[in-house]
UniProtKB/Swiss-Prot annotation:
Keywords (A to Z) from UniProt: Activator, Developmental protein, DNA-binding, Nucleus, Transcription, Transcription regulation
Region annotation Disordered: where it falls in the sequence: 34-68, 142-161, 258-282, 295-336, 387-448
Domain named TCP: residues: 152-206
Localization, UniProt: Nucleus
Protein name: Transcription factor PCF3
InterPro entries: TF_TCP_subgr, Transcription_factor_TCP
Comp. bias regions, Basic and acidic residues: 295-304, 413-432
GO CC list: nucleus
Compositional bias segments (type: Pro residues): 263-277
Organism: Oryza sativa subsp. japonica (Rice)
Keyword Transcription regulation: yes
Task of the protein: Transcription activator. Binds the promoter core sequence 5'-GGNCC-3'.
Record field: compositional bias (Low complexity): 34-62, 391-406
Amino acid sequence: MIKDLRTLESWAKEKPEIEQPALQAVVGGGGLRAAAAAAEGGMEQQAAPSSSTSTSTNSSRSTSDHHAAAAAAAAAAAAQVAHQHHPFYYAAAQGGANTMPAPASFMGSLAIVPAAAAPGGGGGQVQAAAAPVASSEKKAVVAAGAGAKRPTKDRHTKVEGRGRRIRMPALCAARVFQLTRELGHKTDGETIEWLLQQAEPAIVAATGTGTIPANFSSLAVSLRSAASHSSSPRAAPFHHLQQQQQHDVAAMLGFHHHHHQLLPPPPPHQHPEPTPQDPGAGEFMRKRYREADDLFKDTSRQDPVDGATGEAEQKARAAAAAAAPPPTAPSAMWAVGPNTTGATAAFWMQPAWAFPHGAGAGAAGNTVQAPLQFMSRSSFPTAMNVTMADNNNSSNNNLGMLAALNAGGGGRSGEHQHQHEGQSPAEMDHQRRANGGGGEAGGAASSQ
């Protein structure tokens, strides 16, 4: 093969009349490669003529006009050794002859031209031929991807609420739909509201605040719709909290929980009035106050013993007010004397009679009369001053009422009250004897 290449080069040097661009096109288009392949394949293929010979002859004649015979001979010699190659090599040879400049020497062209001609001429056509294949493969991939694309339907279900949509999993939404049908609700939002009402105690236990927002003006529409078809009392989860607060106050003041009936219910004038921009908030608050009033009524019906006790106490208080003498009696003014010792709260927690261990007990025990014990504390100007001096006015009012009731209720009420005050059994026995003496003195005073 090397020998054939050298022979071709020497033949080209001996023919100076051959134009360099034509020779360069023949050599750069694959003439050397074709000669090497022909030397390896044998000489039997050179005898058979082919149509490529005429094609290469026509291309080389169009390239050179004044050297047509020499160019045709060179092209024929190259085609006889390379007729088995693809025709695009010769098309590249024609393009290279028109565009490539003539090199300075023939040996330099052998080193540079094949490397430039192969990517420039043949490479471009190979890429062009491979382009449709790549595009078809891309279309096939896109078609396969389109077949495997996930559906555009949202897996979450949209539920109405507070002017926006709530996104929830499909399983949760299915359960909400089923519950809506079973409860007979009109919308899924109503069902979710019902679920929140049922779970309010657990929500309060978990968060400490609950789900009732502080800004009612932002929930006018929701409250209005909820008030029309509420299936359960809205304030019911908070009833136990209100009762707990009342019980704590009662325990702090020293009397039982049934005395919360003495506390007045909220007056009607404190009910909030609906505003034009928030018509649902006022209705909601009025409903809560009505439910609170119903709660007190239910408690009084469920506890008949406590109710009877409260009625008895009210009757005793009315009888005490009727039997009380005018407040201008100078003999009754001594009752506020123990206030000078600094025991204001202890004085009103205890009945009006004196004890042997108290200050001035000897003189006070002989002069106290039973009717004076029923006198209301508000009748004494000095007692009012004591009340104003104290910070807890409402607590003192309740304590004063309890003191008067315990004084008129006999030994049982006095014993019950002094058990809360932490007295010893000996003091309680002495109190019973004093109660008996006070009752006899009261009977004598009433007979006189």
